[in-house]
Amino acid sequence: MRALAHAAAAALVALALAAALALLGNALTRAGVAHQGEQAWADWRAARSPWRWTLRQPRDVVASRAFGPGRVSAGTDALTVAFAGGALQLGLRLARPASLRQAPLLALHLTRSQALPLSIIVRRTLAAPACVAAAGRLPATAATLRIDLAALRWRCADAPAVMPVRAAMLRLQIAGPAGARIALREAALLPAAPVALTAPLSWSAWRAAAPAMGSVPVVWLPARFSSRLLAQRDALWRRDPAAVALPAGVMPHAPAAPATMPWDWIVIALCALLMLLAWRAPRHLTQRPAWLLQALAAMLPVLLVAFGIGDSQTPDLRSGTLITLALGYALLLTLHEDAALRPWHWLGAWRAAWLPLLPAVLASVLWLLQARHAPQPADFARYLPWAALQQFLVLVVVARRLDAALDRRAATVLAAATLFALGHAPNTALMLLAFAAGLWWAWWFLRRGALLPVVLAHALAGTLLQAIASDSGWLRSLAVGARYLGSGG
């Protein structure tokens, strides 16, 4: 009877945690969309647009390289482009479609330049034919060049055309002789005249209204579930890429000024200090408190990334530092592991090794019901190392220490599953799937101590879920962090 009561209590706690995770994922997504909208609103009011590029590293352009004969490299304060003879293309990254109707001026700031022929290449959608326009020549010396895209002679699919009003792809095509070099520091799309912003419109009012040619609509998105909210935002941008998207009820205002203190780095330094203290804890604490402190220290980088510390559309030095801290600390604990901890191994008894596959079986059922495409072996191979790192950190490093420190198996399973789910924030649907699978995998691992069956099951389930992800579906993608907030349109 007591065992039944404990199981019922654990089930209630699991349901409460799942509800809390859903609320958290939705709240983080709402905050991210609000920040995007506030920044876009402030840009339009300041006679700028949301499409600006700071170019310093190869990663600042599409594919981190030049398309064609040449290469890009990091300069001191600009992106250096070296020509190998012929025309090359530089792709400007678009986190959302660009509105050339509202921002038809292209500004290029060059710190080193030569009078080389320049063309602009645009695709309305990624599947649409390319539209090309000759834009004259770059300046002979360092300067800021402004190009009125609407005044250029455009050709789309080899036929004369007017300027595309939206861009899902935007490239610069520059022809230069071998040995020529330029340095491009910044690029931006700018409005030709001050832009009027509407008062916030409800979703239904915006859908019923005719597109306003001379103003930028500010639209409230009513959805609450994260994937649905992002799908509405993308639908808004497909109709009007210039539109400002805000969660319902959020009044537009300029975002707060960036902090003058490097708070992200201060938090990361405190995280590293806690890890150091936890590493030295066994010298000053008894086993159980030391194990608990080590588990909490290993969890901290995952929690910081989940809540947006050091995360961005392109992973930067902060997120890389947190990931390195987590993996380095996990490796350190493993190499100098307390012999009193319960041992783990890669393989266990084969008769029980199939049990971790149950979440993958459920994922295969979902795939059969709503497959978008067939999963490929290469997808599984790419996912496998990431699955191994996650499960090693959650199960081998954290769960075993929590289990030994708390001596409460149900609490350990719930904590490990929650950590696994938080690592997938703010993707609400993926957080809930990870929590459910994490409960099963943590329970099985703590009973059997074998890691490889869980890793394989995780990689298989992730590969199948990737094959059903859809920008407009309940599972938008397997992306996490700020990358989840990227445009699907």
Segments (PLM) and residue ranges:
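Aromatic-anchored segments of alpha-helical transmembrane domains
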Residues: 298-308, 360-369, 417-425, 459-469
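Alpha-helical transmembrane segments in multi-pass membrane proteins
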Residues: 256-271, 279-334
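Central hydrophobic cores of alpha-helical transmembrane segments
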Residues: 290-301, 412-419, 438, 452-463
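Function-critical hydrophobic alpha-helical transmembrane segments in multi-pass membrane proteins
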Residues: 326-332, 352-422
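Membrane-interfacial loop-to-transmembrane alpha-helix junctions, especially the N-terminal start
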Residues: 283-299, 348-354, 409, 450-451
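Alpha-helical transmembrane segments
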Residues: 9-18, 239-241, 267-272, 290-304, ...
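Beta-rich carbohydrate-recognition modules and glycan-binding surfaces
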Residues: 2-260
